[in-house]
C-alpha cells in the first residue's frame, strides 16, 4: 500500500520519480505527487487520480536534482488534493512523503502542535510540522530523529530540507524501504522494482534506522545515533520482467506465465538425481514439531487451506490455517512444540509480519514461503522457501497462488518421504508437476471458450456463486475472490453441502452458479447440488476434470494428479474473472480500492 521513490544526484529527478511511481502502481493508490528541489526552490505537484494525471500537471520545464515521489492509499482523510503527498511544513522548509499509519498522531497534535493550523487530515502532516518545530533548536537530522522517537506505529519516510540541497533523509519502521546505490546518485524506494532502470544494487534499511543520503553515498544509523554498516545485495530481477510486453494487461501475462513458473519450481527444488528436495534443516524442524499453524491473508490463505490438506495427508502432522488479521486477537491453544508457516507473496504483509513477531516472542519456530528474497518476513523468519514466480504486478494474484501450492506440495511430499509415507514415496512429484504445467498450457490456449462463458454468465450479473466440495471448495473460494476483486461482482465460494443451510435462499432466476468438480468421490454429490439450484432458476455452469466430466459441462479441465487438482482447476477461474472484468469495462490490473501489498494493519 502506497509507494515511495526518492532521488538525489546530478540528473533531473522528474522523469525518474514519475517512472518509478508508475512501477509502484501495482501497490494500489488513489492519489500521487512529487516534490523537486532545485537549489533552494522546492516545487510540489500532487493530485487525486492516476500517475498519468499527475504527469500531465508537472510543468515541462520542472527541474530538480533532488526529489521525492509518492503514491497514496487513503488511511487518514479522503483521497483528494489536500491529503495527497508530499506534505510541507508551515514555512515550506521541509517536504515529506510517508507510508504507514501513525497511531498517536492526534495525541502529538494536542501536545506539540495545538497552535498549528493543518491543511490536510493526514497523520503525515503532523510529522513534518513536528520536524519543523524541533528544527528551531536542532539540526535537521536531530530534529528528524526526535520526531521519529515520538511516533507510535508504522512508517517509511523520505524528507527534504529546502535549506540543504545536498542531502536526502529517510527512515523506516514496519514499512518497507530500500537504498539503491548508483554512480553520482542514490535512490530510495519502497520496492526495488521502482528503480531497476537506475540500479540493481540495494541496501536494506532496518526498523528504527535513519539514513542520510547524498549523491556520493549514504550513512545509516539507529535512532540512538549508532552508525550501522550493512552490505549491499544485487536484486535478482530484470527490468523486462516488470514490463507487459505485448499483453494488454499484467494479469493476463501472469496467468500465461504459470506453466513456466511451475517448471521453474521443479528445477529449483530438484536435486542432481532429479528428485524433489527440500533443505534437510527445514524438514527436521517441521518433523520435530507436533502441530503446524499456517498464517496468511487473502489468496495466500486459500493456498494455505490446500497446503493443510497436502501436509496432513503426507506428513501426518495436524495443521491449522489462520487469517493473519484475526490471529493475534485470540491465540490458539498451543501444543508443546508448534511450528508456524507464513505464506506471503510480497514478504511485507503487515498483518502476517505482526503475527510472526508475536510468535517469535513466544519462542516458536517459523518458516516463510515468499516470492521476494530479502523481504521483511524472509529476513525475520527462521527458515524460508521461495516461490520463484518472478514479479507479480497485477493486484489480483494468479501465478503466486499456484506457485504457493506447488511449493507446499514440494514441502508436503518431502516431509512424507522422510517418514516413509506410502503415497509420498509413490508419487513422482517432478513428473506430476510437469503434467500440471502441460495442462495449464492447454487451458491458457483455450481463452476464447472462457471468454464466451464470462460474457454469457457474468457480463451483467450482480452476484455469482462458486460451489465445491473437499479440495474443490478451497478453489471455489479463490475463484470467488478473483471475480469480486476485478469485476466488482458480489461473488462467494461455498461448500456445496452447505447450500441447504442458508445459501440456497439467495438463488433466484438467472443467478450464476459455477461448480468445480475434480474428485470422483464427490462427483454425484455436487451434481445433485447443481440440480437443486437449477430447479430454483439458477444459471448453472460446471467446470469438471476429464475423469468426471459429463455431457453438458461447459469446460473440461485436463487430468492431473488428484492431490494437485487446485493447480489446474484454478486456471479457468482466473481467466473467467479476467474476461468478466473486461466485459464490464473494469480496470483489470488496478481494481478500485485494492492494494497489491498490504503494508498497514
Curated annotation (Swiss-Prot):
Q: Which SUPFAM superfamilies does its entry note? A: N-terminal nucleophile aminohydrolases (Ntn hydrolases), SIS domain
Enumerate the Pfam families for this protein: GATase_6, SIS
Q: Which reaction does it catalyse?
A: D-fructose 6-phosphate + L-glutamine = D-glucosamine 6-phosphate + L-glutamate
In this protein, the active site sits at 2 (nucleophile), 596 (for fru-6p isomerization activity)
Transferase: present as a keyword of the record?
yes
**What is its quaternary makeup?**
Homodimer.
Protein name per its UniProtKB record: Glutamine--fructose-6-phosphate aminotransferase [isomerizing]
- Species of provenance: Listeria innocua serovar 6a (strain ATCC BAA-680 / CLIP 11262)
Traced from the root, the source organism's taxonomic lineage reads:
Bacteria, Bacillati, Bacillota, Bacilli, Bacillales
Amino acid at each position: 500500500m502506497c509507494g515511495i521513490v526518492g532521488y538525489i544526484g546530478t540528473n533531473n529527478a522528474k522523469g525518474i520519480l514519475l517512472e518509478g511511481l508508475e512501477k509502484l502502481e501495482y501497490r494500489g493508490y488513489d492519489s500521487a505527487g512529487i516534490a523537486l528541489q532545485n537549489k533552494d526552490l522546492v516545487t510540489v505537484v500532487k493530485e487525486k487520480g492516476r500517475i498519468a494525471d499527475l504527469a500531465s500537471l508537472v510543468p515541462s520545464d520542472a527541474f530538480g536534482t533532488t526529489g521525492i515521489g509518492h503514491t497514496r492509499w487513503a488511511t487518514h482523510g479522503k483521497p483528494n488534493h489536500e491529503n495527497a503527498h508530499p506534505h510541507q511544513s508551515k514555512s515550506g522548509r521541509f517536504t515529506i512523503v510517508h507510508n504507514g499509519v501513525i497511531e498517536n498522531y492526534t495525541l502529538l497534535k494536542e501536545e506539540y502542535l495545538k497552535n498549528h493550523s493543518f491543511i490536510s487530515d493526514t497523520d503525515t502532516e503532523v510529522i513534518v510540522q513536528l520536524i519543523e518545530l524541533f528544527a528551531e533548536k536542532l539540526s535537521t537530522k536531530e530534529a528528524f530523529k526526535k520526531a521519529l522517537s515520538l511516533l507510535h506505529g508504522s512508517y517509511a519516510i523520505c524528507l527534504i530540507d529546502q535549506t540543504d540541497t545536498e542531502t536526502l533523509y529517510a527512515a523506516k519502521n514496519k514499512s518497507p524501504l530500500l537504498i539503491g546505490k548508483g554512480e553520482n546518485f542514490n535512490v530510495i524506494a519502497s520496492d526495488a522494482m521502482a528503480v531497476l532502470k537506475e540500479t540493481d544494487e540495494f541496501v536494506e534499511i532496518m526498523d528504527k534506522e535513519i539514513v542520510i543520503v547524498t549523491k556520493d553515498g549514504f550513512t545509516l544509523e539507529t535512532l540512538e545515533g549508532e552508525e550501522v554498516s550493512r552490505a549491499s545485495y544485487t536484486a535478482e530481477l530484470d527490468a523486462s520482467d516488470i514490463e507487459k510486453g505485448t499483453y494488454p494487461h499484467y494479469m493476463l501475462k501472469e496467468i500465461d506465465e504459470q506453466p513456466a513458473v511451475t517448471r521453474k519450481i521443479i528445477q529449483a527444488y530438484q536435486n542432481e538425481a532429479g528428485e524433489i528436495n527440500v533443505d534437510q534443516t527445514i524438514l527436521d524442524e517441521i518433523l520435530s514439531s507436533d502441530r503446524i499453524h499456517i498464517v496468511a491473508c487473502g489468496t495466500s490463505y486459500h493456498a494455505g487451506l490446500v497446503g493443510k490438506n497436502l501436509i496432513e495427508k503426507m506428513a501426518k502432522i495436524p495443521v491449522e490455517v489462520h487469517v493473519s488479521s484475526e490471529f493475534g486477537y485470540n491465540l490458539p491453544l498451543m501444543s508443546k512444540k508448534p511450528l508456524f508457516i507464513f505464506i506471503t507473496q510480497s514478504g511485507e504483509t503487515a498483518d502476517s509480519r505482526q503475527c510472526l513477531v508475536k510468535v517469535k516472542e513466544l519462542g516458536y519456530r517459523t518458516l516463510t514461503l515468499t516470492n521476494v528474497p530479502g523481504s521483511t518476513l524472509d529476513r525475520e523468519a527462521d527458515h524460508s522457501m521461495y516461490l520463484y514466480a518472478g514479479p507479480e504486478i497485477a493486484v489480483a494474484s494468479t501465478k503466486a497462488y499456484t506457485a504457493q501450492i506447488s511449493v507446499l506440495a514440494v514441502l508436503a511430499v518431502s516431509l512424507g518421504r522422510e517418514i516413509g509415507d506410502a503415497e509420498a514415496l509413490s508419487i513422482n512429484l517432478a513428473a506430476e508437476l510437469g503434467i500440471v504445467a502441460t495442462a495449464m498450457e492447454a487451458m491458457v490456449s483455450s481463452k476464447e471458450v472462457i471468454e464466451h462463458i464470462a460474457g454469457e454468465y457474468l457480463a451483467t450479473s450482480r452476484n455469482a456463486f462458486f460451489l465445491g466440495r473437499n479440495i474443490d471448495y478451497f478453489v471455489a473460494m479463490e475463484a470467488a475472490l478473483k471475480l469480486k476483486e476485478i469485476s466488482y461482482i458480489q461473488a462467494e465460494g461455498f461448500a456445496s453441502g452447505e447450500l441447504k443451510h442458508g445459501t440456497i435462499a439467495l438463488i433466484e432466476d438467472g443467478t450464476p452458479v459455477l461448480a468445480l468438480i475434480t474428485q470422483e468421490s464427490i462427483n454425484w454429490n455436487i451434481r445433485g447440488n447443481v440440480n437443486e439450484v437449477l430447479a430454483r432458476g439458477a444459471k448453472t455452469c460446471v467446470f469438471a476434470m476429464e475423469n468426471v466430466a459429463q455431457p453438458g459441462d461447459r469446460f473440461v479441465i485436463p487430468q492431473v494428479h488428484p492431490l494437485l487438482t487446485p493447480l489446474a482447476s484454478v486456471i479457468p477461474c482466473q481467466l473467467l474473472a479476467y474476461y468478466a472484468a473486461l466485459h464490464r469495462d473494469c480496470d483489470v490490473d488496478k481494481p478500485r480500492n485494492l492494494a497489491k501489498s498490504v503494508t498497514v494493519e
